[in-house]
Structures are given as C-alpha cells and as structure tokens.
Design a protein with these regions (language model features):
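C-terminal hydrophobic helical "lid"/dimerization subdomain
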Residues: 2-4, 238, 286-335
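Glycine-rich beta-strand-centered segment in the early N-terminal region that forms part
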Residues: 19-36, 49-93, 132-135
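NAD(P)H dinucleotide-binding glycine-rich loop of Rossmann-like/cofactor-binding domains
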Residues: 90-170
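Mid-domain Rossmann-like dinucleotide-binding core that forms the NAD(H)/NADP(H) cofactor-binding site
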Residues: 133-215
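A short acidic, Gly/Pro-enriched loop at the edge of an enzyme's catalytic core
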Residues: 218-227
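Glycine-rich phosphate-binding loop and adjacent beta-alpha segment
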Residues: 235-300, 335
C-alpha cells in the first residue's frame, strides 16, 4: 500500500491510500520515493490559477528522487534498484500517458505520466533519469525541476555571459535560486529584484545589489544586458523589457496565472530588444543532469545555498503556505 497527495478541489488536498496495481503498464516504472519537491506549478494548481482543472481529483507533483521498485516489460532505460530522478521534462523512453487508480475507498483517482507527491510513484519511462552517484538525494530532487529550469537558462540559453555582463534576476524562489547560483559561478554582475523580507534576509549572504522598489527599477531602465524573470508576474515580465538596453535580452521561466497576459511596447522590439520563454531551461535531462552537476564541480551546491525545508506528506498544505509567504525557496516532502 502507498499514500499520495490528492488535489480534490481548489485549496483542498487529501491524503489517500492506494494498493499497488497487480501489473504495471509496459511503459511504466514504479519508484519508491525518498523526497518530492513542491514547485510553482503545484501551487498554481492548488490556488486554481491554471484555469479549469479537468482531471480532478488527481495526484500531482513533478519532481522527485527515489529507487526503482519495479518496471514494465518494455522499459529498458532503468532497472530495479537504480537510484533515479523524476521530472516533468520529457526525456528518452516510452510514454503512453496518464492513468487512473482506485483508492482503498474504491474511488477513481487520476494520475499523470508523473505524479510525484506520493510515497511510491508510477511514472512513464521518459520521466525517469539515473541519479549521479556523488549526488546527494536531497540535492537530486531539485534536479527534477528547479535546477534544470533555473541553471539551464544560464547554461543553455545565455551562453555568452561574461564577467562584465550585467544581469538582472527577478524573483528568488526555487527556479530563481538555481539561476542565481549558476550566475554566481559565471562571475557576472548580478542585480536582484526582490521585496519579500524572508528572501531579502536569505540573500544577504551573497552580498548582491538589490533593487527593492519602482524608483530603483526606473533608475536602471535600459541598463542591463540580460534580465532573467522567475517571479510569475505578468507585470514583471513587462518591466523586464524596460530594464534591458536596446540589444538586451529577457528570458522568463515564470508562469503567470491563466488570463494574465503581457503587453509589449512594439518599439522595444524595433529597437532590438529580445524576449524569450524557457521550457525547462531547454534541458535534455538524459545528458544535462550530468552536465549541470559537472558545471557545479560535482558538488551538492543547492542544498548548501538554498532555503530548503522538509515536511511530512500530511503537512503538505503548510508547506505550500510557507512557500507562498517566501519562508522557503523549496519545500520538500520527505517519505
């Protein structure tokens, strides 16, 4: 038997018990989970800001780490006993989509190709990746979403960063913190836009220039070479274009609520300003997990330089609330 967090409706999470299926689908991998992370996507679902949810009630979550417990008959990527990272980012392997499973009360519950907030996860083969041997389990869970998205932007989309490059980073949540640590290793000129008091206290250790209000932002109009936007605010994505100079670039990995749109001054684009979205930091995790780990000198960098807090599964609503308040960069469910 295993337990999973089930989103019943907006702002209502329940913990359900499930019996293991008698047989896995041919593309599926069963993983006993050590840690699972809560990121902005789950919080958006919880708050009902992704629009109408057609799959309620459903398990959710999309980054985790654990050990392979069983595999479907056509799975070749991993074997029983392998230590693996789970991610929403698709890699090599089979993927025949989501499925339903009855809980112990005989109610049908929806599961996706990966639904990670569960003591045991049944995932499609293409969402499962081998964990590097030297990588700590707690570090590894962040490689399911936060690290490839944040650090991936820096390594895959901003390859020309130099020491004299002026970079503005907006928002220091899980993805923003990963981008920050990658930028610090690039030794460029970093400015942070943040006004959450918990996060400002955390940022003191890095001794960076902080832009806290609109006055300071206006002073830096047309100033930056690059702006990385991770706050999830449509208004801040718009503001990013004001901050870069005419040949500058904005990359945003944030996901504003459904119905929030950005308005762009056409003259910004005529000037030569560029704006790009980022899908998982343009990462291919079958190779980029190792690539990013190597970039950080095979060290467990993120658990040493992030505000991470562990919670039990039955404290998941508290974990979400503390992320929303900015008390932690990443909330981790420990199983």
């Amino acid at each position: 038997m295993f337990q999973a967090a089930i989103l019943r409706k907006k702002k209502k999470i329940e913990i359900h018990n499930f019996n293991f299926p008698q047989k896995l689908r041919c593309d599926q991998v069963l993983i006993k989970i050590k840690y699972a992370g809560i990121c902005g996507s789950q919080i958006m679902e919880y708050l009902g800001k992704r629009g109408k949810d057609f799959y309620l009630p459903h398990c959710f979550g999309h980054e985790a780490v654990g050990k392979v417990f069983a595999i479907g008959k056509r799975v070749t990527k991993v074997k029983i006993g392998d230590k693996v990272i789970l991610s929403w980012i698709k890699g090599k392997g089979l993927d025949f989509g989501g499925f339903t499973l009855k809980n112990t009360k005989k109610e049908k519950i929806n599961f996706g190709p990966i639904s990670a907030l569960s003591s045991h996860v049944i995932a499609c083969e293409n969402r499962v990746f081998l964990k590097p041997d030297k990588m700590n389990y707690l570090e590894a869970v962040l490689y399911g979403c936060a690290v490839p998205t944040g650090a991936g932007i820096v390594l895959n989309q901003l390859k020309k960063i130099r020491e004299n490059t002026k970079v503005c980073l907006i928002g220091v949540g899980g993805v923003g913190n990963a981008a920050l640590l990658a930028l610090l290793k690039k030794k460029c000129q970093i400015y942070i836009v943040e006004n959450n008091n918990y996060k400002l206290k955390f940022l003191k250790k890095f001794n960076l220039k902080i832009l806290k209000n609109n006055f300071e932002l206006r002073k830096h109009s047309n100033f930056f070479d690059i702006c990385v936007e991770t706050s999830g605010s449509a208004k801040m994505i718009e503001k990013s274009l004001d901050l870069i100079h005419p040949s500058g670039m904005v990359v945003f990995a944030s996901h504003p609520p459904k119905g929030d749109y950005i308005k762009i001054n056409p003259h910004h684009l005529i000037q030569g300003k560029k704006i790009f979205g980022s899908w998982g930091g343009c990462c291919h995790l079958d190779k980029d997990i190792q690539k990013i780990f190597k970039f950080f000198d095979y060290k467990n960098t993120f658990i040493k330089n992030s505000k991470i807090k562990k919670y039990s599964l039955n404290k998941i609503s508290l974990a979400i609330e503390e992320v929303l308040k900015g008390k932690v960069n990443r909330a981790i469910i420990k199983f």
